[in-house]
Curated annotation (Swiss-Prot):
Disruption phenotype: Embryo lethal.
Ranges for domain CS: 142-231
InterPro entries (alphabetical): CS_dom, HSP20-like_chaperone, NudC_fam
Keywords of the record: Acetylation, Chaperone, Coiled coil, Cytoplasm, Developmental protein
Residues passing through the membrane, by range: none
Induction, per UniProt: Up-regulated by heat shock.
Name the UniProt record assigns to this protein: Protein BOBBER 1
Organism listed in the record: Arabidopsis thaliana (Mouse-ear cress)
């Protein structure tokens, strides 16, 4: 037979003991808080005496860290989703607004106000621009679709093909200081534009050759320059490749002939990468000066 008091003592001894724990956690010293926890465990329990105490503590720490990582990851995902959703909403609203705007504007737009469609330029035109200056023809000019022109230093000759049997009275030819306009009456001008350089209108002439070619003679104002084109806007020639007719040099006065010969010489020198007449003259002067002053050291001197 059991006594009631003994039963109560047995039941009370089987219950776990609860001890209050008081400590303050400082964010600056979290390890201090843990030290107090372990001190408390050592004083109030036999947990630290267990051989597996350290392993159990490590497992608990790892579990806490894993739990923290999961919580942070979940929070980061929520924060990243919100801006994306908002951005997507804004994009959808914009697209809807644009569509509504287009639908409402369509009936009121006039055909003339439609945006012009850009037409792709032919490859030939692009190639011409990229290719740069063209090689001159045998007359140091250019053969174009509607006319051709040749030149020497004093004059430019323009030849314009016209229907066979064309009479002079049907030709319209206006030669001004800086402009040339040529064509047939009642038709659009064949040539109409600003000249590359000015001419002397009083010394310019035109005539019909064999009733099928309008030939125009333009006398240059500056008779020491090669023209790159006859009318501005037309393809330009490479004046470095101009070849003057040597047979005509004898017709020039001595001064002009000397200048032309100098220009021809300089042009050939440049094409070969050699010094021009002016550069050669400077070199001769420098050599003479150096020979007259042997006492001076020019080894480190730089010459332009």
């Amino acid at each position: 037979m059991a006594i009631i008091s003994e039963v109560e003592e047995e039941s009370s001894s089987s219950r776990p003991m609860i001890f209050p724990f008081r400590a303050t956690l400082s964010s600056a010293n979290p390890l201090g808080f843990l030290e107090k926890v372990f001190d408390f465990l050592g004083e109030q329990s036999d947990f630290l005496k267990k051989p597996s105490a350290e392993d159990e503590i490590v497992v608990a720490v790892r579990a806490a860290k894993e739990k923290l990582k999961k919580a942070e990851k979940k929070k980061a995902e929520k924060e990243s989703v919100k801006p994306v959703e908002k951005k997507a909403e804004k994009e959808i609203v914009k697209l809807v607004e644009k569509k509504v705007e287009k639908e409402s504007v369509k009936p009121t737009i006039a055909a003339s106000s439609a945006e012009p469609i850009e037409v792709e330029k032919p490859k030939e035109e692009e190639e011409k621009k990229e290719s740069g200056p063209i090689v001159p023809n045998k007359g140091n000019g250019t053969d174009l679709e509607n006319y051709s022109w040749i030149q020497n230093l004093q004059e430019v000759t323009v030849n314009i093909p016209v229907p066979t049997g064309t009479k002079a009275r049907t030709v319209v030819c206006e030669i001004k200081k800086n402009r040339l306009k040529v064509g047939l009456k009642g038709q659009d001008p064949i040539v109409d534009g600003e000249l590359y350089r000015s001419v002397k209108p009083d010394d310019c002439y035109w005539n019909i050759e064999d009733q099928k070619v309008i030939s125009i003679l333009l006398t240059k104002s500056d008779q020491m320059e090669w023209w790159k084109c006859c009318v501005k806007g037309e393809p330009e020639i490479d004046t470095q490749k101009v070849e003057p007719e040597t047979s005509k040099l004898g017709d020039l006065d001595p001064e002009t002939r000397s200048t032309v010969e100098k220009m021809m010489f300089d042009q050939r020198q440049k094409q070969m990468g050699l010094p021009t007449s002016e550069e050669l003259q400077k070199q001769e002067i420098l050599k003479k000066f150096m020979s007259e002053h042997p006492e001076m050291d020019f080894s480190n001197a730089k010459f332009n």
